[in-house]
Design a protein with these regions (language model features):
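Histidine-rich, glycine-flanked metal-binding segment
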Residues: 1-51
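Di-metal (Zn2+ and/or Mg2+/Mn2+) metal-binding site signature of metallo-dependent hydrolases
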Residues: 47-69
Length: 185
């Protein structure tokens, strides 16, 4: 059994500073002036304690890539997609994983524990999807990561993309994304 006592927390809906007693990962009591024996006592000195944040739209496969291989000088989505295609030619699974892990750690440090990322599932080698599935497994004790199979190059505009999307789902992606503004439909 593990216990944590968080002292002097500022919480939404509470006028006064509040204490939180956590027993085996569950809030056992929330109130002022709590005094329980605990394995760990943390005085947060009036800082905000809240439920974790959710970042519902990330592209962890593309993070930390500004200027690689070049800058998007027009600022348009189409140029950005073209640059992504150029970047994919030399992008390794290890680079994707390292960048994703770094950004996940930043997210967690800033209060996010639930993340949804889009993974380029139409990239023909499967590198992106495999990398992010591995990162999800590696980081599962730190964050809840949902992976959306994202058709960066559309589903129906290119032969074989339907199969790539289906494969991404079989490998373990949680949802299917889309690009309705670019898809032939």
């Amino acid at each position: 059994m593990s216990t944590i006592l968080i002292k002097n927390a500022r919480m939404r809906g509470h006028q006064e500073l509040t204490d939180l007693y956590i027993k085996d990962g569950v809030f056992a009591e929330i109130g002022g002036g709590l005094s329980y024996p605990a394995d760990e006592i943390i005085d947060v000195a009036g800082k905000l304690v809240s439920a974790p944040f959710c970042d519902a739209h990330l592209h962890l496969d593309a993070v930390l890539s500004v200027g690689k291989p070049r800058y998007n000088m027009s600022g348009t989505l189409i140029e950005g997609i073209n640059i992504w295609g150029e970047r994919m030619q030399g992008l390794t699974k290890e680079t994707i994983k390292k960048n994703a892990r770094d950004v996940i750690k930043w997210e967690v440090a800033n209060g996010s524990m639930f993340l949804r990322t889009h993974a380029d599932a139409t990239e023909p080698t499967g590198t992106v999807v495999e990398a992010l599935l591995e990162v999800r497994e590696e980081m599962k004790d730190l964050v809840d990561l949902q992976i959306v199979a994202f058709p960066q190059e559309c589903i129906f505009t290119e032969k074989g993309h339907t199969d790539l999307m289906e494969n991404a789902m079989k490998l373990g992606c949680d949802a299917v994304g889309g690009l309705p503004y670019m898809e032939y439909s």
